[in-house]
Amino acid sequence: MKASQFFISTLKEAPADAEIVSHKLMMRAGMIKKLGAGIYNYMPIGLRVIRKVENIVREEMNRAGAVELSMPVIQPAELWQETGRWDKMGPELLRLKDRHERDFAVQPTSEEVVTDIARSEIRSYKQLPVNFYQIQTKFRDERRPRFGIMRGREFTMKDAYSFDRDTDGLRKSYENMYDAYVRIFRRFGLEFRAVAADNGAIGGSGSHEFHVIAETGEDAIVYCPTSAYAANMEAAEALPLVAERAAPTQDLVKTFTPEKVKCEQVAEFLNIPLETNVKSIVLATDSDAGPQIWLLLIRADHELNEVKASKVPGLAEFRFATENEIVEAFGSPPGYLGPIDMKKPVKVVADRTVANMSDFVCGANYRDYHYTGVNWGRDLPEPIVADLRNVVAGDASPDGQGTLEICRGIEVGHVFMLGTRYSESMNATFLDENGKTQPMQMGCYGIGITRILGAAIEQNFDERGIIWPAAIAPFAVVICPVGYDRSEAVKAEADRIHAELLAAGVDVILDDRGERPGVMFADWELIGVPHRVVVGDRGLKEGKVEYQGRRDAQATAVSVAEVVGHVRSLLAN
């Protein structure tokens, strides 16, 4: 391909609303153009990268035995109402009506539609297992689209759905997809981690997220460097910091703490370590009998993990209590709350670490007062104990193999074991060997195709622009002739190299735009093509051209007779 037949539109400066590196560089490189909030045109350079990503995903999905189909972007509300997600999804699900006032959803995922296909087409155990996948446009009506394509509203996603006879079959399908994802991300040439995760709104019994490691990642990735343990922050298990509770050494004392409403203020006022304080978090659950108030206790230097809190029996649909509810239950305003002398029945849940603390400090349920020397069993009943907190670096790894570290990651893939969550609600059944009706066991497996672009850039860039991994670069090689429109020798040699690389199946572009060398080089460094060949009169007089890899600090001279072989050998490696 020649640049004059392509479309290249680069910018010297990023738009003012571009926040992160990938957004800035994609806009500057002319890969995307903003059309609306969270909605982008994918320009030719960007679309070439998307197609490279899609091809790798498609090859590995086919290799894994999945079958490609395509499901509608617009889906009837009735299917979503069958599973309850029509209401549960909230405003992120874009709803619309047609001219007949019938309700539809713009798909964010396609569990309902694919389950409808399965229940219509699959009758017997002989038709299982099967795994359907699509690469399709999705839409989520994000409240605050940001970071370019990283958190856009319209995006391209590969979503796959497996159907099995039993849980053993589901486990095999899940492992098959997990292995396929590992191959996919390795082929992309990205540093990534697969981590244990929570299933979230999709539901099910087990899941892993695939994260591209990047300092700018939104997600915290917890891992043990001396073992295989890895999880996202929501799912990472926090062990108690001491194995056994020490015996009390202090008396319970109601202590004056004037206007000290934060744990840090209390610790400083009492001249005690922050980690001896316990903070109170008040939640509520609603029922026909009225709200139930819950008191969650976390060590003052730790943070509540809301996903873990929702897994405490009875707290699945919690909300944070109102100030009126707090005053009514505790007789005190926030800032002085604790588990002693509460005014109404409150369910007390202590984090594992708090449950093993002794002689701790907490609110006294009285303005300007806290209790010191608090001990379980002596001063208040033993609590419900649960893992409620986020882990911190240095915590013991749950597998007992070392301590935990935390890095940042960008989620680009997710695999779920759904079980019968959808098949039961939509009556997707089959007849087993004994003629008995059974619900299908389902798994679902997503990869954010367009998000891969942003994640790859966040991991691979420098001050000059993008550095694409070879497998997903828009072009493998760019030929930059200096004076292409002025020198017959330069034109002839550039055309020869271009033709030979094309004949060898290399994805190459020749820049015949007639731009000055500085502009030409800057454009291709910004766009991030991995290999560059420069042809000029000065080098040709010595029978040489210049080769430079995108990560190379300096160019090297290569003979004109060897340059095609040199580039091909680099591509092969």
Swiss-Prot record:
It is found in: Cytoplasm. GO terms for biological process: prolyl-tRNA aminoacylation. CDD domains: ProRS-INS (cd04334), ProRS_anticodon_short (cd00861), ProRS_core_prok (cd00779). It comes from the Bacteria. Transmembrane segments: none annotated. Keywords: Aminoacyl-tRNA synthetase, ATP-binding, Cytoplasm, Ligase, Nucleotide-binding, Protein biosynthesis. Pfam families: HGTP_anticodon, tRNA-synt_2b, tRNA_edit. Gene3D superfamilies: Anticodon-binding domain, Bira Bifunctional Protein, Domain 2, YbaK/aminoacyl-tRNA synthetase-associated domain. One of its GO terms (cellular component) is cytosol. One of its GO terms (molecular function) is proline-tRNA ligase activity. InterPro entries: aa-tRNA-synt_IIb, aa-tRNA-synth_II, aa-tRNA-synth_II/BPL/LPL, Anticodon-bd, Anticodon-bd_dom_sf, Pro-tRNA-ligase_IIa, Pro-tRNA-synth_IIa_bac-type, Pro-tRNA-Synthase_IIa_type1. Its main location: cytoplasm. It catalyses: tRNA(Pro) + L-proline + ATP = L-prolyl-tRNA(Pro) + AMP + diphosphate. SUPFAM superfamilies: Class II aaRS ABD-related, Class II aaRS and biotin synthetases, YbaK/ProRS associated domain. Its EC number is 6.1.1.15. Consists of three domains: the N-terminal catalytic domain, the editing domain and the C-terminal anticodon-binding domain. Catalyzes the attachment of proline to tRNA(Pro) in a two-step reaction: proline is first activated by ATP to form Pro-AMP and then transferred to the acceptor end of tRNA(Pro). As ProRS can inadvertently accommodate and process non-cognate amino acids such as alanine and cysteine, to avoid such errors it has two additional distinct editing activities against alanine. One activity is designated as 'pretransfer' editing and involves the tRNA(Pro)-independent hydrolysis of activated Ala-AMP. Homodimer. Belongs to the class-II aminoacyl-tRNA synthetase family. ProS type 1 subfamily. This is Proline--tRNA ligase. It comes from Cupriavidus taiwanensis (strain DSM 17343 / BCRC 17206 / CCUG 44338 / CIP 107171 / LMG 19424 / R1) (Ralstonia taiwanensis (strain LMG 19424)).
